[in-house]
Amino acid sequence: MSLEHAILGFLNYAPMTGYDLRKAFDTSVRHFWPADQAQIYRTLKELTRRGWVTVEVVPQEDRPNRKVYHLTDAGREELHRWLRAPSDPEDPRVPLLVKVFFAGQLTNEETIALLEGYAAGLRARLEAYARIPQQAAHYAEAVRSPREVFFWALTLDYGVRLTRAALEWAEETIRHIRNLEEES
């Protein structure tokens, strides 16, 4: 996936400012495709150059003009082309697993501490996932499409399942290391 296509997807729902896009990312796809404000504006500039979006300058009193971005027909065609294209499996790189691979060079306590920190992060992620439905409610009302909301829920389910599996692995690995301590 690319940031470009995520932005095209959001603009397909409605015209938005860069700030609106940042809020949309933060309350929806951030957990599997984060983007900061600078990346969003840089990408909007490129999308405008390609003719996939247009920008409407809305004058405001006592504040800078607002730039509202609109999806063009060419941008919609690109979004649909990308949506139909096959997806490659995810990048298999997991930095934690490289550390675990070489953890024989650490004490068991150090490795357990590493894994406990990882597990704590996963628990925090699950808590954040639990808040997503209420955060996304605003966008669900704006889109007014049960079909769209259904697909949003599928991505959340994927994230929850993946995170639970990683947490289960981390907890089981900690148990194995503790058993290794007892056998030594």
Q: Locations of the language-model features?
A:
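Amphipathic alpha-helical coiled-coil segments
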Residues: 160-175
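Acidic interhelical loop/turn segments
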Residues: 132-154
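Tryptophan-centric aromatic hotspots in well-structured domains and transmembrane helices
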Residues: 32-33, 101, 152
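Amphipathic alpha-helical dimerization/coiled-coil segments
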Residues: 81-131
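Amphipathic, well-ordered alpha-helical segments in soluble domains
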Residues: 17, 21, 43, 49, ...
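Amphipathic alpha-helical coiled-coil segments and their boundaries
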Residues: 108, 115, 122, 149-152, ...
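Long amphipathic alpha-helical coiled-coil segments
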Residues: 172-184
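Basic helix-turn-helix/winged-helix DNA-binding cores
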Residues: 1-93
